Amino acid sequence: MIDQITIGDKSSFEDFEASVAQRKIKMPKKKSIKETVPFSNRTYDFSAINGEVYWEERELEYIFEITADTPEQLEDLKREFAAWVAGVQEQELYDPHIPYYHFIATYDDLDPEDDEGLDKTTLTVKFTAYPYMVADSQKVYEADLAASGQTTLNVLNESTHPVPLTVSTTTRITMKIGTAATAPLSPGSGTYGALKLPTGLTTIELTNSEAVAGSVRISFHEEVF
């Protein structure tokens, strides 16, 4: 099986004859916030002062090999491949060596090496990416709400950190995630960056603010290192 990556509706080998020869998936670096105390050996780390540590972008490096039948074909493939990767901006990058998850990647650099003869070349491509790998599949929890009724959902988040929720509701509701209550949510669907689901098992309390029955759908993508 040919080793390749997929971004959008194109794959490196199927569309550009570029197979992955090597890959380097780096861990993101921690965003450190430290303060030293004068005339002291102590250093204080405030990186998690808001309850969560934050991370720099992750670096991805792929070495591709392109083989062609003629020098002219090789040059065409190189140009097309370079144009493809250079246009990658916060897109989903799928690597078969990392099943069930993908990266949110942006093109950073392309370094072409000297052609190996007339029909083969090697190109090193670097991407920067969102620090976490994102699950391909959503987790979905649904509930029906009686008129002015209340129900609870036990939601499991196996991510490395709290993740944002997408909520779809047919009536005006109030959500309580663990011990934190939210403002009422109007009917419709939205992803709420400030509405974070903690890691582990969390009880979500849903209250219907209207005198008609409704339904709620909660979804999210797990994120891991």
Placement of each model-derived feature along the sequence:
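Oligomerization/assembly interface segments of phage tail-like spikes and tubes
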Residues: S47-E72, D119-Y132, T202
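Short beta-strand and beta-hairpin "edge-sheet" elements
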Residues: K26, E90-M133
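Intrinsically disordered, low-complexity segments enriched in serine, threonine, and glycine
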Residues: M133-F225
